[in-house]
Amino acid sequence: MSKQTASNRGIIMIPYAYLVNSNTGVNIANRSKQVDIYMKNCCVACLSAKKYNDSDTDVALVTNIDPPKEYRDILESHKIKIIHADFDLFNFSGEYTWALAFYKLCALHHVLHEYDYDYYAYLDSDVFIQSSFNNIWTECDAHILLYDINHGLQVKHYQHILSEMRDFMPSLFSNGNLPTHYGGEFFAANRANTLIFI
């Protein structure tokens, strides 16, 4: 597929994937309404991003499904892009905890390689954007921005990650520093750094 030239300088993506029998958020008690619950969240995230950002920033729902008509109509009426991207990368077994969360990386890969933006960002679907991304884009000129989940040493999961990293790369720990544990809830970077990241 040839790359599409983007008319705007940045894109804010809300990725959403659905695969039957794959694990997703632990807060979804009613699996039969999973798509509906997530689509409502996606609409709130996309609409708030659109409201607070200027016309130089595109907002997109990136998904592997055809959104139900009621949500598609809402998004399209607010000039929010709907980008279809198959879940063909970073796809682990459906039993894997948070298996669908890795779709964010897949969506980022597809949009990066199919659209030519200066800046790329993705966020979880359960967010409300409260201001413009212009300052984020400026910071992306020098940095990759990620969300620090603030796991302390009291968190067993973090202890296991540190143990594995220490075994793999002892020099990383030689000065007593502990690496920051980043979550996948937020990512933003310029094009060059996104290419390195992905």
Q: Residue locations for each model-derived region?
A:
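N-terminal anchoring/stem segment of glycosyltransferases
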Residues: 2-92, 115-116
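A generic fold-level signal
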Residues: 6, 100, 122, 179-182
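Short, solvent-exposed loop/turn segments at secondary-structure junctions
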Residues: 19-23, 65-68, 88-90, 127-129, ...
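Short His-Asn-centered micro-motif
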Residues: 61-65, 103, 123-125, 147-148, ...
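GT-A fold catalytic core of metal-dependent nucleotide-sugar glycosyltransferases
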Residues: 104-156
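Conserved catalytic core of nucleotide-sugar-dependent glycosyltransferases
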Residues: 133, 137-197
